[in-house]
Regions:
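Conserved Walker A/P-loop ATP-binding site and its immediately adjacent core
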Residues: 224-243
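Domain-level recognition of nuclease-like catalytic cores that cleave nucleotide substrates
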Residues: 120-171
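Inter-Walker segment of RecA-like/P-loop motor cores
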Residues: 252-282
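Catalytic centers of nucleases
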Residues: 20-114, 128
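Walker A/P-loop
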Residues: 194-213
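Conserved pre-motif I regulatory segment
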Residues: 168-197
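Walker A/P-loop NTP-binding motif
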Residues: 208-221, 241
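Single conserved hydrophobic/aromatic residue that forms the stacking wall/gate
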Residues: 280-292
Length: 292
């Protein structure tokens, strides 16, 4: 069952919009606890189950899920099961921005804290200009998960519907092909005697995947890798692919030198709506600020 099949099922079988929204929120909770890009999440609450919701108004005023990371940061998450051609307008995001700006007591430490990230999950990628303007340069930062990101997630959606999550809900992993195995073997032998080298492969032969497997082999699935790319879009594509195919979870620290990266540049191929916006780092930006 594909993600599109799930959407069709929700839309055709739900009695009300609220019923459809509730099913979607529960599915997104399971997805966040399964997709390897979010492996640093230790807990994801439905809004009604979040212990500190009273500090944020109690009622459902824009936040659908709350997630906690390994580092103790909290994310405010909104889930919208829209039609694919729907356009998100500013009123739709205003209450989410307002509620996620408030402070609350950390359920673990009982200390006053605030959200470190905002995440907006929706089944449409269309944003109105006023809504687009409203989410720029926000603190905490605003990150988007769109339809394409959900469709390309390496999870088995049927297993999520059946109640499984985590590694049990992942699609079967890739296996290296013969030409990739030869490249991996050659790289392993080469780096026994050299500090640097170059691997040249044709388009469509799996360079990103082969590079991942070479890195895992050289580092024995632990250590640090410096991965440099010339554009934001390649950063997003590469890290998404590595997270999906890695043997062990990857903790990525994404650093961008492009001053335009925080703005939407319509004429730039590296549009900030690219899925790189969805990649989360460990340590968190908040922890990195503390260490300065």
């Amino acid at each position: 069952m594909t993600f599109n099949d799930i959407l069709h099922k929700f839309r055709s079988e739900s009695f009300t919009q609220k019923d459809k929204g509730t099913q979607f929120e529960r599915l997104m909770r399971s997805w966040l606890l399964s997709d390897p890009r979010y492996s640093n999440l230790t807990k994801v609450w439905l809004w009604d189950d979040f212990p500190s919701r009273a500090d944020l108004g109690g009622k459902d005023t824009g936040i659908d899920l709350v997630a906690r990371t390994e580092e103790g940061d909290y994310w405010a998450i909104q889930c919208k099961c829209y039609k694919e051609d729907s356009v998100i307008d500013k009123p739709a995001v205003d209450s989410f921005l307002a509620t996620s700006s408030r402070q609350f007591k950390d359920p673990e430490t009982l200390q006053t804290t605030s959200f470190a990230k905002r995440m907006w999950i929706s089944t449409t990628n269309h944003w109105g200009k006023n809504a687009e303007d409203a989410i720029q340069n926000q603190n905490p930062p605003f990150n988007r998960v769109g339809l394409v990101d959900l469709q390309n997630s390496p999870v088995d959606w049927q297993l999520l519907i059946d109640g499984l999550k985590g590694k049990e809900a992942m699609l079967p992993g890739k296996q290296p092909r013969e030409h990739q195995l030869r490249a991996m073997s050659a790289a392993h032998a080469y780096f026994q005697e050299h500090d640097r080298g170059k691997l040249i492969m044709a388009c469509g032969t799996g360079k990103t995947y082969t590079a991942l497997k070479i890195a895992e082999d050289l580092l024995n699935n632990k250590g640090l890798v410096l991965f440099m790319v010339p554009s934001i879009s390649l950063l997003g594509q590469s890290l998404n692919a590595w997270c999906a195919d890695a043997v062990n979870p990857i903790k990525g620290i994404c650093i961008c030198s492009d001053s335009r990266a925080s703005r939407k540049i319509k004429k730039d191929f590296d549009d900030t709506q690219d899925s790189v916006c969805l990649l989360y780092t460990s340590p968190s930006p908040r922890d990195m600020r503390r260490s300065r």
